[in-house]
C-alpha cells in the first residue's frame, strides 16, 4: 500500500436506509453561491438566498452522504431530496429557529403528549 492510498470496496455503501424522502425544488435567488451541508436543518438554510417551501423542510436534512454538501450557484434551481432527522429529533444552533424538539405541537403546547409547562420527557 502506498502512503495516502485508498482501497475501496467495489460495492456501493448504503446510507440513510429506511428513511422516507421527499423531493423539494430549491432556487438560489441570491447573487452568490450557497452551500448546504449534509446534516444542516434545511428549513433554516439561508433565508435570504434560497427560495423553497420551508414548511416541507421542517425537521429534515439532505439525503446525501455525511460530511458532504450541495452547492447552488447564483440563479441555479434544482430538486433536492430530504429525509427526517433521526434520534431524539432535537435541533440546536444553525440559525436558532428551533433550539429544541422538532415534534413539539405548539398549538397544544405538548411534546409527544407531555405538557410543556411541566417539563420535557425524561431522557432514557
Swiss-Prot record:
Q: Which GO terms describe its biological process?
A: urea catabolic process
Which CDD domains does this entry report, sorted A to Z? Urease_beta (cd00407)
The protein's location, in the record's own words, is: Cytoplasm
Please verify whether the record's keywords include DNA repair: no
Q: What sort of enzyme, by top EC class, is this?
A: hydrolase
Q: Which InterPro entries match?
A: Urease_beta-like, Urease_betasu_sf, Urease_subunit
Q: Which pathway is this protein assigned to?
A: Nitrogen metabolism; urea degradation; CO(2) and NH(3) from urea (urease route): step 1/1
| Entry EC no(s) | 3.5.1.5
What UniProt keywords apply to this chain's record, in alphabetical order?
Cytoplasm, Hydrolase
User: Which Gene Ontology cellular-component terms appear in the entry?
Assistant: urease complex
Pfam families for the chain: Urease_beta
List the molecular function annotations (GO) for this entry: urease activity
Record note on quaternary structure: Heterotrimer of UreA (gamma), UreB (beta) and UreC (alpha) subunits. Three heterotrimers associate to form the active enzyme.
Entry's family note: Belongs to the urease beta subunit family.
Specify the protein name: Urease subunit beta
Lineage of this protein's species? Bacteria, Bacillati, Bacillota, Bacilli, Lactobacillales
Could you tell me the gene encoding this protein?
A: ureB
Amino acid at each position: 500500500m502506498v502512503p495516502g492510498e485508498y482501497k475501496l470496496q467495489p460495492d456501493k455503501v448504503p446510507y440513510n436506509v429506511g428513511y422516507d424522502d421527499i423531493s423539494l425544488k430549491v432556487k438560489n435567488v441570491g447573487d452568490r453561491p450557497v452551500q448546504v451541508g449534509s446534516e444542516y436543518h434545511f428549513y433554516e438554510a439561508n433565508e435570504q438566498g434560497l427560495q423553497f417551501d420551508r414548511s416541507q423542510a421542517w425537521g429534515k436534512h439532505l439525503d446525501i452522504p455525511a460530511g458532504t454538501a450541495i452547492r447552488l450557484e447564483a440563479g441555479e434551481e434544482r430538486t433536492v431530496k430530504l429525509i427526517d432527522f433521526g434520534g431524539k429529533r432535537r435541533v440546536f444552533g444553525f440559525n436558532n429557529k428551533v433550539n429544541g424538539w422538532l415534534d413539539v405541537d405548539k398549538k397544544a403546547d405538548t411534546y409527544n403528549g407531555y405538557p410543556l409547562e411541566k417539563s420535557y420527557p425524561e431522557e432514557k
